[in-house]
Each structure stands twice: as C-alpha cells, then as structure tokens.
C-alpha cells in the first residue's frame, strides 16, 4: 500500500478517516453475522476521499502475489504450487495479510478493482471486512469438514484453541470445525476481486490445517496462470469396469494427463469382452489426444498364467509360492517360463494399438528384505542353483545356519545383479516388438534406491547398474517414489533428482512417479495427498524432472482435478515488456488466452478457445487479430515451432519419444511430414496420429 504523502489536504482526509474508523470500531459487537453493507456504509464514505490513492492495477493480468509481512510463512509455497509468483506489492494482484495486519480503507478499492486479499487470523483489517471475533466461547479445533470434500477426514496433528468468528453476510464458508460448525475458512466476492479469510496460519509447510485453500481461491474467481498437458497417470480397469470411457478421456485431458499407463495383465490372454473394453478405451483416449501405454508388472503375469503353470511359480525363502499382496510372481529365470511370458507379451503388444510399453517394478520382493523370509524372493530352484554354482552354498542357508554378513552380502549383490540382467533382457525383448511398431516408446519404472538406500538390499533395485543402459537404449527411466518416504514433504523431489543426475548425462530421460494413495504412516491432515499438499508435490516434481507420473488416476480426488494441470506447469519467469508478455518455461506451457496472438512477432496458430500453447524456453506474446487459418488446438508431444501459412494451412515442428497426437480446429485433408506427402492417420474427425521423433508437419484443412 502506498503512503498518503505530505500534502496538507491529504492529511486532513487522513485525519477524517481516522476519526470515522474510530467510530466504526466502537460500534457494539453482535453475536450473529450482520449485513456487510451496514458495516461498510461509513467506510464507503471514506473511500470517496481515498480514490486518488488507490493503486492502479497495472499488473492485474500477471500472476504476482505479495505477503505483507517480513515473515511470509508458508504462503509462498502454497501460492507458488499453482504457478503464482512472489513479487513486490506494487506490481502484485494477490495479497496476503497475516495475523495482526493493520486496517486501511484503501483495500476496498483494490479488491473491487480486481485484487485478491487473503486474510489470516484476527486483525483490524479482517475486522474491517466483517471477519471478527464473536462473543462466543473459543473452540478447540482438531478436525474440519470442507465443502470441497465433505466426507474426507481432515485432522490436525496439533489442535488449537481458536476464537469463534463472525463472518459478513454474503460470505461463503468453505471449512468448519467438524463438531461445533465454527467457520475456519470463508470467502467473499467484492466487485472484480475477492477476499479469502482463514482462522489461523496454514502451518509450517502450508497444508497442515487447510488442504483446500487453493480450491477456495479458485471458487472465488482466481484463475491459475499456467497449465501443463504433460502428466502421465496409471490406470487399472479393475477400478473402472463399467464407466463411460469417452467421458473419462475428456476428464483426463482436462486434468493435464498426456498418457495413460494401462494395466495390461488383465488382457494377457485374449478374452472378447475385456479386449473390446480395452480397444474402446484406447480409441477414446486417442480421440482426446491421450497416449496409451501397456503397463506390465512382471514377474506378475496374469491370474490365468499363475493358475496354469504352478511349476513356474516363484518361491519365497520358506519355499512357499510367492503370492505377495496382489502380485503372483513367476520364475522368469526359468527359460521355459521366460519364453512363454515373452511370447505372450509380444502377442499382447501386437493385439492393441499401444503407444508405448512400461516395464514396472521388475525386481524382487519385499520391502522388508531378508528380515521377513516368508516374503523374500527369489528362492526358486533355478536361482538357488545359479548362486550355489557361483558361491558354493545354497542361499537358503542364510535363513538358517549361515548368518554371517559376508555370505549375506554375497547373495544380496548377486540378487541385485540378477535384477539388472532381467531388466536388460526384457528391454531387449521389447526392442523386438519395436521392430514391428517403430513408434513405440519404452519406459522402465524403477523404485528409488538413491534417496532410500535400503531399497537395494530390500528388493534388489540398483539404479546405478541400470542407468548406463540409457547410453545404448532409448527409454524413459521412471523413478518410483518408495512407500518408505511417502510421508516426507515435496522438498524431497529436488533431492532425488540431484542424486540421479549424478549417475547419467541423460537428464531428459529421467521421470518421477508419485504414489497418490493412503499412506501407512501417521500423516496429517489427510491420509492421502490432496489439495495443497498434492499440488506442492506435483509442482516440485515437475520442476525437478522432465516428466511426472501419478499412481493412479482412480485415486485422484475430484477436488484436485481442476488445479492439477496448473500444479504440473514449470514456469520460471513471466513479465511485461512493453505491450508484450514474456514467459519462460522448462517444457512448454499453456496460458489462458482469448482471441488471436503473436508469439515472437509471428501470428500463432497453437491455441484452443481458452489456452495458448507455447514451446519450451522464453517467448514473447502479444494480442493480435485472430488468424483466419486452422489452429493446432492440442498437441501430445513437445511443440518446437508453429506458424500460420495461409487461410487453410498451418505448419509446426514437434518432437516426441512416442507417437504424437495432434488435434486441429478443422478436418485435415492434406498432410506433409518433412516435405513428403503422407496419408493422414486419423484417430478422430480432426485428430491426427504422427510418427515418433522430430518432424516438421505441414497441414492443409477443409
């Protein structure tokens, strides 16, 4: 807020305002909410004298926020998780006034002209807007209910005793203390702006108390500044057996999901009904511009394969069949078993129109390692014979008479080497499928063993042995967030990324898999990541890795879908330079946009009715007349360049590790790729399938 200065007439106005504010503050308290208009009538009289001091909203279209305190608390992490950027108050549109903030009637003009003001706790400024302590007894707050997910238990690790606040008439209560109903968060729209009030600070990390603050801001009209369309998500048809796949494909695309990794073991053996469902799912995804990967969980093959081949089942250290949790593990060291499984995998990859294959968790059980013999694998006869030939003893002795550390270390190292050879062997098998389908992308999902170093001994995972394969093979190394660190905060993702970057020069091939599930640890305020916690996780991960995958789409809660794509956007800079807006992003980004635009001085055809899509790097955007030609409304691939050629033609350059999918505003009629005429391969009326790699596309439409 700006100073009134030293002008004599301004001083008189300030004194008048002070007296009127004193009278206002002296009005008797009421126990029930009272109309905002009656409270603010006198303040609107003051406002007329203060119009000249209202800050000009010169940066209203920039996603800047300012915390009006030397101690910003967790607000930068909260607001930054959906792309808002911290800047000085003079250029910001969003303001956080922390507990004890001083009142100023200047705020009415700011809010009515578009500012968003967040009020934390009790203050004279909150009182000014009608959020004030009532005469009711304080309440002990330990649990909340929130309108965004009323049935979700929201439990605070440390309860607080808080006043019961009155809220102004017309305000919407978003969260209440679960038993008394006392308001904990509430919001109010004023003119073009809004007020969000919270009863207490949000917590050290920003999500300990009020998980849906960002959802409340969105309800009040705050639009996120960026969106990404690069997320991956895992999909298991067992949770979506009778759903409208067209509806869900549209929903996934709106949430920023670029690829679905579909549980392929359900279709390992041909079955008419299941195969028809999967074919329909793939077609629906392709129409919406979503890629579909076959997700394998070897050594689990399928229920039928397990039932049909008892002799090939994996064994635990107590010589029981390795049916562990939902996975029924097969002995892939056995050459007959391997040949049967590899033939089935090749057939499955060939039966459906996949865009890629994901080999996930291709190592051994379990997270408890040798401490739990009933879950420890592999202990089948083939592995035991191989190890005995090499080391001179049966590894089963490790769970009996041979308990020395040297022997134990010998087998654990052998086991990690076996897992690495198994991974390389299966990547080679998939290269055979790639010969028939050259556009297939390959992914190896591998649990983290750098951040949680115990994983190598527990399950045989050793990233340092696997990552050199990137020197000779083309695949994405998808790092799975291990269950042992699910309770840690989002700051772990930059740390994980740093450790893996030290192991390989192929940083663009590193991705991270976030498990969005109920955690077994004692975590607060929700058992599953949701709201601000989820957005912080996704945002930190997107800023640290080339790709972010979510396990799994069915576990994502409905309130999270609207802001998920914004949390996944990684933008380092946005600023005005004259009439242009400069945006710098790591992997390309979408920005809210209506009407035509120029990007870097050229008419830009890559936009839909609401979003303009930019390539990675810095780009200057400015308004322009709407181009008459076709538009590239969606691209599942990395956009490198685009230009409007004429009223019927556009040209763009893309790069993709898999097949790419492009959706246009008009029906394609003629296609040239790298200067060569090609027959359009359509997945929908205006949806085009494009080859893997980097290519220049020239498209003529009707």
Where do the model's predicted regions map?
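A glycine-centered loop/beta-turn motif at secondary-structure junctions
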Residues: 62-63, 77, 115-116, 165-228, ...
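Substrate-binding cleft/loops of secretory-pathway carbohydrate-active enzymes
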Residues: 367, 423-493, 523-526
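Substrate-binding cleft of secreted/luminal carbohydrate-active enzymes
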Residues: 473-490, 494-570
């Amino acid at each position: 807020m700006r100073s009134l200065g030293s002008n004599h007439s301004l001083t008189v106005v300030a004194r008048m305002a002070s007296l009127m504010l004193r009278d206002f503050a002296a009005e008797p308290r009421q126990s029930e909410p009272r109309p905002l208009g009656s409270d603010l009538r006198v303040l609107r009289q003051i406002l007329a004298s203060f119009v000249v001091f209202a800050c000009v909203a010169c940066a209203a279209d920039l996603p800047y926020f300012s915390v009006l305190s030397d101690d910003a608390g967790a607000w930068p992490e909260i607001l930054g998780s959906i792309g808002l950027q911290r800047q000085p108050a003079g250029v910001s549109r969003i303001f956080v006034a922390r507990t004890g903030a001083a009142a100023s009637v200047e705020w009415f003009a700011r809010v009515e002209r578009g500012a968003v003001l967040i009020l934390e706790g009790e203050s004279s400024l909150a009182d000014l807007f009608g959020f004030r302590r009532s005469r009711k007894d304080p309440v002990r707050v330990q649990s909340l209910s929130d309108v965004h997910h009323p049935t979700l238990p929201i439990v605070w690790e440390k309860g607080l005793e808080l006043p019961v606040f009155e809220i102004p008439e017309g305000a919407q209560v978003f969260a209440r203390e679960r038993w008394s109903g006392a308001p904990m968060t509430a919001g109010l729209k004023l003119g073009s702006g809004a007020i969000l009030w919270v009863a207490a600070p949000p917590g050290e990390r920003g999500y300990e108390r009020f998980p849906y603050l960002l959802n409340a801001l969105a309800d009040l009209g705050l639009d996120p500044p960026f969106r990404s369309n690069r997320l991956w998500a895992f999909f298991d048809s067992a949770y979506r057996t009778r759903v409208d796949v067209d509806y869900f494909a549209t929903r996934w695309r709106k949430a920023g999901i670029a690829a679905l990794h579909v549980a392929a073991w359900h279709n390992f053996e041909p079955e008419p009904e299941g195969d028809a469902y999967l074919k329909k799912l793939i077609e629906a995804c392709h129409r919406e511009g979503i890629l579909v990967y076959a997700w394998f969980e070897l050594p689990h093959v399928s229920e039928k394969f397990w039932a049909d081949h008892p002799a090939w089942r994996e064994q635990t250290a107590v010589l029981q069949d390795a049916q562990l949790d939902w996975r029924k593990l097969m002995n892939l060291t056995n050459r007959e078993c391997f040949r049967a499984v590899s033939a089935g995998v090749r057939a499955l990859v060939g039966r459906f129109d996949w865009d890629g294959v994901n080999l996930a968790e291709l190592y051994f059980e379990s997270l408890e390692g040798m401490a739990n013999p009933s879950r420890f694998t592999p202990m089948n006869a083939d592995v035991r014979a191989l190890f005995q030939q090499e080391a001179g003893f049966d590894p089963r002795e490790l769970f009996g008479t041979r308990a020395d550390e040297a022997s134990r270390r010998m087998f654990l190292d052998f086991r990690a080497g076996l897992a690495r050879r198994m991974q390389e062997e299966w990547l080679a098998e998939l290269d055979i499928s790639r010969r028939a389908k050259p556009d297939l992308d390959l992914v190896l999902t591998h649990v983290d063993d750098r951040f949680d170093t115990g994983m190598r001994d527990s399950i045989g995972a050793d990233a340092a042995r696997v990552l050199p394969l990137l020197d000779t093979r083309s695949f994405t190394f998808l790092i799975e967030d291990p269950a042992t660190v699910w309770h840690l905060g989002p700051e772990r993702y930059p740390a994980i990324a740093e450790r893996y970057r030290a192991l390989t020069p192929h940083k663009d091939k590193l991705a991270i898999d976030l498990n969005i599930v109920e955690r077994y640890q004692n975590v607060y305020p929700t058992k599953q990541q949701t709201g601000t916690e989820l957005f912080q996780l996704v945002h930190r991960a997107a800023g640290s890795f080339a790709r972010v995958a979510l396990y799994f789409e069915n576990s994502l809660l409905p309130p999270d879908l609207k802001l998920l794509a914004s949390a996944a956007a990684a933008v380092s800079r946005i600023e005005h330079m004259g009439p242009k807006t400069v945006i710098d992003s790591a992997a390309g980004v979408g920005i809210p946009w209506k009407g035509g635009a120029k990007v870097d001085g050229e008419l830009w055809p890559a936009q839909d009715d609401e979003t303009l899509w930019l390539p990675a790097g810095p780009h200057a955007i400015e308004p322009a007349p709407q181009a008459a030609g076709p538009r590239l409304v969606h691209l599942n691939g990395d956009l490198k360049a685009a230009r409007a050629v004429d009223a019927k033609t556009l040209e763009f350059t893309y790069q993709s590790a898999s097949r790419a999918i492009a959706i246009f505003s008009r029906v394609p009629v003629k296609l040239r790729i790298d200067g060569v005429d090609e027959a359009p391969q359509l997945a929908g009326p205006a949806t085009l399938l494009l080859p893997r790699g980097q290519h220049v596309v020239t498209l003529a439409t009707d």
